[in-house]
UniProtKB/Swiss-Prot annotation:
GO terms for cellular component: cytoplasm. InterPro entries: CobW/HypB/UreG_nucleotide-bd, P-loop_NTPase, UreG. HAMAP family: UreG (MF_01389). It comes from Marinomonas sp. (strain MWYL1). It is found in: Cytoplasm. Homodimer. UreD, UreF and UreG form a complex that acts as a GTP-hydrolysis-dependent molecular chaperone, activating the urease apoprotein by helping to assemble the nickel containing metallocenter of UreC. The UreE protein probably delivers the nickel. This is Urease accessory protein UreG. The keyword Nucleotide-binding applies.
Length: 213
């Protein structure tokens, strides 16, 4: 029976911490799972270069897709470029356990095509204000996991984490959300646990994740 690769879509606004999250996840999981990454940028491959330069994975496990125009189209209406990139990674590395697909910076209405993503993570950050969860949108309400990142900035911007938690619960119902601060690895172990359990990956004894950003 052919092994199924778990495809995880990672979306969120520009600057919310998507690429930093991928760097952290790859660093923590790469010795235990066969992983690759596809990044999306409009006119550059900056996110792919960032991950390569910081040795999140070997360079041949990271592919950058230049979407041109609207980045939403490449993850939703026409995912062909991303699907081709995944196929290329599978040809290189055989049966991958996980492929992360990072979207270009998007808004709260962005969603991944089911053809492209089996599990979706949406990243917002505290610096945008504590009203973001209540604004809703598919990224907030429908993603499999919502990450509220950069909790260390809450006092600096006057944001209430209690308000954000309250609104996230209302918007998401039973769907999980996690507060994170990747600079201290806060929330990272819990994120990995959810990916493994919900993605039906083989459970392994992974040490506590360390901050790498």
């Amino acid at each position: 029976m052919k092994k199924q690769t778990l495809r995880i879509g990672v979306g969120g606004p520009v600057g919310s911490g998507k690429t930093a999250l991928l760097r952290s996840l790859c660093s923590a999981m790469r010795d235990y799972y066969n992983i690759a990454v596809v990044t999306n940028d409009i006119y550059t491959q900056e996110d792919a270069k960032f991950l390569t330069q910081h040795e999140a994975l070997d360079a041949d496990r990271i592919l950058g897709v230049e979407t041109g125009g609207c980045p939403h189209t490449a993850i939703r209406e026409d995912a062909s470029m991303n699907l081709a990139a995944i196929d290329q990674l599978l040809e290189r590395h055989g049966a991958l356990d996980v492929v992360f697909v990072e979207s270009g910076g998007d808004n709260l209405s962005a969603t991944f095509s089911p053809e492209l993503s089996d599990f979706t993570i949406y990243v917002i950050d505290v610096s945008a204000g504590d009203k973001i969860p209540r604004k809703g949108g598919p990224g907030i309400t429908k993603s499999d996991l919502l990450i509220i990142n950069k909790t260390d900035l809450a006092p600096l911007v006057g944001a209430s984490l209690d308000v954000m938690a309250h609104d996230a619960k209302i918007q998401r119902g039973d769907r999980p959300f996690i507060f994170s601060n990747l600079k201290s690895a806060q929330g990272l172990d819990e994120i990995i646990q959810i990916i493994v359990s919900e993605g039906m990956l083989e459970a392994k004894e992974i040490p506590a994740a360390k901050a790498v950003v």
